[in-house]
Amino acid sequence: MTERALDSTRVYDGRIIAVRVDTVALPNGGRAVREVVEHRPAAVVVPIDSDGNVVLVRQYRYPVGKTLLEAPAGIIEEDETPETGAQRELQEEIGFRARALRYLGGFWSTPGFCDERMHVFLATDLEPSRLEPDADENIAVERFSVSEIQQMIQNGEIEDAKTVAALLMAI
């Protein structure tokens, strides 16, 4: 059931993504065109504070035109492991670092057209450790009990897929 690339053309190279158009050979002998968004892997972190609350960030997301509640997350830089990327995102987005960081697993964000792999971590035993946030991020930090998180997922208040997946993996 695999497809084999016959031709590949990069049509866009940006700071965060690249886009290529591939012609592939199908298992049935046919051909198809696949548009692929190339995206670096990302770390998604579910931080739990000393009171047992989940720490999330609220930030405006231009592509969807609204403010979303999300787990701290971001691209893993070329010189980073998923763990170091997760720690950096925690420091940039919520001002803490985790003394205990446990890998929960990974998933493909949107495998129908994108190769982004999300690595999910549970962060506990948090200690203050601030890094400067990215210049283009405007983030509010909020805390919620696990029961509040479960209710917010059920009622659709948390709309970001990576956050829903990471929270369900963690709690």
What are these regions (language model features)?
Residues 32, 41-44, 75-161:
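Unchanged
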Residues 2, 34-39, 43-88, 135:
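Conserved Nudix-box catalytic region and its N-terminal flanking loop in Nudix hydrolases
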Residues 4-7:
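Loop-helix junctions at membrane interfaces
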Residues 167:
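C-terminal boundary of histidine-terminating zinc-finger modules
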Residues 27-28, 49-51, 60, 123-128, ...:
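Short loop segments at secondary-structure junctions
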Residues 21, 35-36, 59, 108, ...:
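Short clusters of small/polar residues that mark proteolytic maturation junctions
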Residues 9-44, 50:
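Acidic, metal-coordinating catalytic segment for phosphate/diphosphate chemistry
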